[in-house]
């Protein structure tokens, strides 16, 4: 592809996804621990040849969209229309001010689009002007009539399954969409069909069987199982932290402000529960400890909320393609009493970590009045974290 080609993406995410079952629009449901739309958008956002990603969303989904794609670079979302075709046109019109050379049009419900497919889409549009990814049909296809009886068996060798991203010269597909809208044509099921109607020759390029569209509840179950099977490297880490009491009227424990007659002596907010948990996660990653990532000698972390330390550790797991399986913290103290706040702390850890509360445990014990915790001079915490990473044979000893 010539370096002068500017490529943008229309990410279509305005549908309601009713066939996917309960749980809201399918593009905002999680798959493999991440929202479907996040996975789709991230693939394009990180691609070196894509300069703009234009999301098209349902106006009722604004809050869900913002939460689902937090941290990803994209254009301000534009509202979709009553049909997919109308939504694509809205996305193209929103991109017109950027004057891209190439545009890729992708369904947000396809979260497993690869860098290779994206690169092939850009290259194909640059060479041909209009192209779509396809995969061969492996089953025998039957054409049936109104009676349900078989009327014909088409030649499987000529059949292909169309996928997205479908790629086009921007000016050509924008004009085709505008013409279709002007002529009152709203029955096209994909952008290639509009291009064909407009008289364009649509080329094909190699798609990817993994780049499937999530449509039914069974699709989600199957893909969750596939992703879980890929995360065969199960690791566990442990952490420990302690802080002495000082002056104050509260302490931070597991992300929760707890009223107390004393405060913590600490460089940050002194949240021993979260500090131990961060060390456990970093330990599972073999990625140093909290002090190496957030040195107490750095004034930047003076009084810092420990929420950001835990978010950082969770992001390190995600960067390795992993998922958190379980988080557990045990608080060791006489006071304050942890029991009444246990579920509040679990919920807060789950919220910070982006995991279900069923994967978070908070326990409490005492040292039977022994040692510094028994004398109520401070609080200690131990933690464990279990994570799953993609299996990499090269990291295993022979």
From Swiss-Prot:
Q: Which PROSITE patterns match?
A: ISPD, ISPF
| General function of this protein | Bifunctional enzyme that catalyzes the formation of 4-diphosphocytidyl-2-C-methyl-D-erythritol from CTP and 2-C-methyl-D-erythritol 4-phosphate (MEP) (IspD), and catalyzes the conversion of 4-diphosphocytidyl-2-C-methyl-D-erythritol 2-phosphate (CDP-ME2P) to 2-C-methyl-D-erythritol 2,4-cyclodiphosphate (ME-CPP) with a corresponding release of cytidine 5-monophosphate (CMP) (IspF).
Q: Which GO terms describe its molecular function?
A: 2-C-methyl-D-erythritol 2,4-cyclodiphosphate synthase activity; 2-C-methyl-D-erythritol 4-phosphate cytidylyltransferase activity; metal ion binding
Q: Does the keyword Nucleotidyltransferase apply?
A: yes
Q: Gene3D superfamilies from the xrefs? A: 2-C-methyl-D-erythritol 2,4-cyclodiphosphate synthase, Spore Coat Polysaccharide Biosynthesis Protein SpsA, Chain A
This entry's Enzyme Commission designation comes to 2.7.7.60, 4.6.1.12
Which lineage?
Answer: Bacteria, Pseudomonadati, Pseudomonadota, Alphaproteobacteria, Hyphomicrobiales
Q: Keywords in UniProt for this one?
A: Isoprene biosynthesis, Lyase, Metal-binding, Multifunctional enzyme, Nucleotidyltransferase, Transferase
Q: Where is this region: 2-C-methyl-D-erythritol 2,4-cyclodiphosphate synthase?
A: 235-398
Q: Which InterPro entries match?
A: IspD, IspD/F, IspD/TarI, ISPD_synthase_CS, MECDP_synthase, MECDP_synthase_CS, MECDP_synthase_sf, Nucleotide-diphossugar_trans
Pathway named in the protein's UniProt entry: Isoprenoid biosynthesis; isopentenyl diphosphate biosynthesis via DXP pathway; isopentenyl diphosphate from 1-deoxy-D-xylulose 5-phosphate: step 2/6; Isoprenoid biosynthesis; isopentenyl diphosphate biosynthesis via DXP pathway; isopentenyl diphosphate from 1-deoxy-D-xylulose 5-phosphate: step 4/6
Organism, per UniProt? Bradyrhizobium diazoefficiens (strain JCM 10833 / BCRC 13528 / IAM 13628 / NBRC 14792 / USDA 110)
Site positions (Transition state stabilizer) are 19, 26, 267, 366
Protein's name in the database: Bifunctional enzyme IspD/IspF
User: Which reaction is the catalytic activity of this chain?
Assistant: 2-C-methyl-D-erythritol 4-phosphate + CTP + H(+) = 4-CDP-2-C-methyl-D-erythritol + diphosphate; 4-CDP-2-C-methyl-D-erythritol 2-phosphate = 2-C-methyl-D-erythritol 2,4-cyclic diphosphate + CMP
GO aspect biological process, one term: terpenoid biosynthetic process
